[in-house]
Curated annotation (Swiss-Prot):
It comes from Clostridium botulinum (strain Hall / ATCC 3502 / NCTC 13319 / Type A). This is Small ribosomal subunit protein uS4B. GO terms for molecular function: rRNA binding; structural constituent of ribosome. The gene is rpsD2. GO terms for biological process: ribosomal small subunit biogenesis; translation. One of its GO terms (cellular component) is small ribosomal subunit.
Amino acid sequence: MAKIRDPRFKLSRRLGVNIYGHPKAMKRATRENSREGKKLSNYGKQLLEKQKIRSYYGVLEKQFLRYVKKAMKSKERTGDVLLRSLECRLDNIAYRIGFANSIRQARQMVNHGHILVNGSKVNIPSYEVKTGDVITLREKYRKNDEFADNFLALKKFSLPYIEKDYDKFSGVLIKEPERDEIPIDANETLVVELYSK
């Protein structure tokens, strides 16, 4: 399976935004290795925003293009549909619930069958989580200190579209996320413009 292999901190500095949420990701950023302060053409800005979103969700170009085409067919605002579709990927929802400390780790957990959807094992990271779906950490992995610590450490962090049950090690997508609720720093409108040419 193809993967994005760029070093995470280096990629964050190159894009000029902490796409992985790690506190040390931007510490060594300088004007030479960061986008900050650099003038970009309109195309360059569009490309940069695409790279941010792709890198954040960890999807390759071919896969990303499928999400864009699907969003363009919708009658709703294309950028909103694009981000909503990416946000509702199983690996991302598992990360948002708190089973992992990164999307990469969440993807690995899904691949290895650690995550259940409505009680059934799903090992496809791109699986689209729907409203009402219950996402659970398999019982035998709840004793894993790393997974348990990740989950319990995020009690103070909550999103309006996810409801957590700390006793059952589960989370439910209670509604489709709105754009202003999705915690990602990117301009999806520029991405839509890029693919609309």
